[in-house]
Amino acid sequence: AFLEMKIRIERAIEQRTTMLAGVSHDLRTVLTRFKLELALLGDSPEVEAIKKDVDEMAAMLEAYLAFARGDTGEQSAPTDIAGLLEELRLDTERHGHRSTVAFHGPAEVTVRPAAFKRCLANLVSNAARFASTVAITGHRDHRWLTVTVDDDGPGIPQQSREDVFKPFLRLDDARNQDEGGTGLGLAIARDIARSHGGDITLGASPMGGLRATVKVPV
């Protein structure tokens, strides 16, 4: 009975993934057509506003699909985590935020590279959305890889920290994770961390804002 249930679940996931692939292709086609038509209209404040909306819709579509699809199809590979954190620091500074990075211990860890980068990028972009400075720190020992993302933003009250991992949740305070985003970033990040055998926790940062900690076995 357990084996039959497992087969049914796997079949349902496969059907869902196939359906999502078809839907995503159709929606991407429509959005691409919008972009081409807008490009023919020339430059004006109205056209630029519509272009921004279309870009936002495209980003939301990709986030929804990433959440529904998961990351289990990617193969694990040795990955330079220190180099990955440096890439995230540069991306953060390109968007106008101050950022620091530090890594301690052996830098190579076997993870699913694209998925793990998405996990960390979601945490860093969430921090940057509400703060002016983001500090990224990695540490690897013989058992665990730990990455912390600290910021100087408004933080999240202790009683709400688990709630922000729920998809599409809107907080009622200054740090609304859906502000300028899809409301899926932290949910996707935690799913990826857990699929690596680890987890993400949130706490108060010594910088005054939020500390997000990713911990996965090595």
Label the predicted regions.
Residues 98-110, 142, 207:
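Conserved catalytic submotifs in the C-terminal HATPase_c
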Residues 180, 185, 189:
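Short alpha-helical Gxxx[C/S/T] motif in the catalytic ATP-binding
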Residues 7-52:
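Membrane-proximal coiled-coil signaling linkers
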Residues 197-198:
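Conserved glycine-rich
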Residues 70-74, 108-111:
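Conserved micro-motifs of the catalytic ATP-binding
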Residues 133-143:
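Short beta-strand/loop element within the Bergerat-fold HATPase_c
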